[in-house]
Amino acid sequence: MNHIEKENLDSLFLYHGNVLGAARTTSMALNSLINAFDQLDCEQEEIFARYEELATAIKATRPRITPLSHMLEQFEEEMKPFWSKDLDKLRAQAKKILKNKVKLYKSRAERVVRHGIQFVEEGDGIIVHSASSMVTNVLLQAKQVMLKDFSVIVLQLDPVRTPQVALTLEEQEIPHIVIPAFNLCHYVEQANKILLGAVSVTRDLKVVAPVGTSTTLSLCRLNGIKSYLFANSFHFSHGLADAQRIYQADENIASSRSTYRLTTHSHDLVELDLIDTLIDEDGEVENERLWAFTG
């Protein structure tokens, strides 16, 4: 894979990560890999090299999609006895393992949601900065299953995801408003909670989250608004924050009077200390489990 192809792969994952979130991007990528094995058209001895080239590039995307990297690592370990098998057996085993990984990932996400709905209470005013699939499903299940009445403040993020979230809330008749994130200060008295998802949680206890999360969380903390982060354990990274490869872009901006260079980052790094409650597939993560994770 040449430099341009790697840049295109980065852009592809960055776009899907921003629009779909890390959870749905992980499932989509695994299903795409299943289709790729199904359509293999090469010599048997070429397969591992081709897979390894693609997997290496995926694991090096900016930012790193931690759950997808974990899934690929498990897949590679389970495939070790099968890379030398004939093409039909190799293909069948690869598809079987990958399908099981999709099921495993989805089952952990569903368990997070089951625990998460316990943190939505009657009369809550909930801020949603970037509605990950887990956050969206927590809200839906709290309404549909627990029959809770609450309202949502949706912070405008992008032209794709924000309308999707607003439509979902509208369809479920969940009271909500959509506002620019920079106007949140005018609405803090209407909220008591903020629900968040994450691309990853690092071993030095940083959260890789959508851009703007750190500013929003700081304002919430200043105003006594409790924060809840939902992330199944596949989002917990082996690495530290500086290994997460957050994408940095530099762009020359020209005006009528001057030209300046604008530097932006694709995601925020948030101190886990800013989060009041972390929920994974086993429920609320207590300090003992966090200490075990940090090693």
Where are these regions (language model features)?
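Long amphipathic alpha-helical segments
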Residues: 1-97
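Non-catalytic, soluble scaffold/interaction modules
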Residues: 56-84, 100-105, 109, 114, ...
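Ligand-binding beta-strand-loop-alpha-helix segment within the catalytic cores
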Residues: 77-122, 150, 154-194
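Gly/Ser/Thr-rich loops at beta-strand to alpha-helix junctions
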Residues: 125-136, 159
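Histidine-anchored nucleotide/phosphate-binding helix
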Residues: 132-145, 217
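Conserved phosphate- and dinucleotide-binding cores of soluble alpha/beta proteins
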Residues: 144-146, 155-295
